[in-house]
Amino acid sequence: MDTASLISRLLDVIEADIAPVTRKGVARGNKLFGAAILRKSDLSVVVAETNNEIENPLWHGEMHAIKRFFELPGDKRPDVKDCLFLATHEPCSLCLSGITWSGFDNFYYLFSHEDSRDSFAIPYDIQILKAVYAVPEPETGTVSPDRPLYNRANQYWTSHNIVQMIAGLDRSHKEELVARVDDLNALYADLSAAYQQDKGSKGIPLA
């Protein structure tokens, strides 16, 4: 499958499979992060889930999807190496670890950590990665501001930023996909507004 077709399918899944369950989750007081696990062979959805922190603060969108995936009967659950992992938002440190420990060799995401902070008013992904993992240089006692927050390609997995993938396409494919991303930006802006209105009222530690 060519890159444009892959991206189109991933946007389909966000719009048709993840966003509807996320809308219900946000209505209950959860954050707007969601995820899906697809078969690499035909890009069919195995599970699509959303954040469920009002039940357990560890049930971020990705972690909740992983939980549901491993609850499937073994004969209905594909091997993780045969799966594509899709997150609406760039995974936080918890979810990066969950993806790694679960054995997935990839993940794709639409919104970046910076988007989570700047567009959705949820700054904890960057804050925690910097506070917990960014060890200062012994010589200076500081951390370089240009230091990456994590290794986006490593021995366990390779990450894929969908917006950057679109930017690398030729114009004939790019314009339609950019328009679809704009629509998803609007959709998630509405979800964010709904979450922010009730934020802090459901007992989520880092709301």
Question: Where are the language model's segments positioned?
Answer:
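Short, flexible loop/turn motifs enriched in small residues
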Residues: R28-L32
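Short beta->alpha transition motifs characteristic of CBS
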Residues: V47-E53
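Short beta-strand scaffold segments in enzyme catalytic cores
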Residues: F33-R39
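Zinc-dependent deaminase
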Residues: M1-G25, S102-A207
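Glycine-biased flexible loop/turn sites that connect beta-strands or occur in inter-domain linkers
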Residues: D42-L43
